Swiss-Prot record:
Keyword Hydrolase: no
Name of the featured protein: Large ribosomal subunit protein bL34
Keyword Ribonucleoprotein: yes
Biological process, per Gene Ontology: translation
Superkingdom per UniProt: Bacteria
Organism taxonomic ancestry: Bacteria, Pseudomonadati, Pseudomonadota, Betaproteobacteria, Neisseriales
InterPro entries per the UniProt record, alphabetical: Ribosomal_bL34, Ribosomal_bL34_CS
Organism: Chromobacterium violaceum (strain ATCC 12472 / DSM 30191 / JCM 1249 / CCUG 213 / NBRC 12614 / NCIMB 9131 / NCTC 9757 / MK)
GO molecular function annotations of the record: structural constituent of ribosome
Gene3D superfamilies: 1.10.287.3980
Keywords of the record: Ribonucleoprotein, Ribosomal protein
Family: Belongs to the bacterial ribosomal protein bL34 family.
Pfam families in the record: Ribosomal_L34
Any one annotated GO CC term: ribosome
Length: 44
């Protein structure tokens, strides 16, 4: 059986990257929440 996590940098960036987050209102909310919390990494 193949494992579920098959890492791919391209796919990772395209689905969870900063620019993708900034596209939608919800994504911007995620970034804002992470900024407020003081996260070192805002997005992948």
């Amino acid at each position: 059986m193949k494992r579920t996590y098959q890492p791919s940098t391209t796919r990772r960036k395209r689905t969870h990257g900063f620019l993708v987050r900034m596209k939608t209102r919800g994504g911007r909310a995620v970034i804002a929440a992470r900024r407020a919390k003081g996260r070192k990494r805002l997005a992948v």
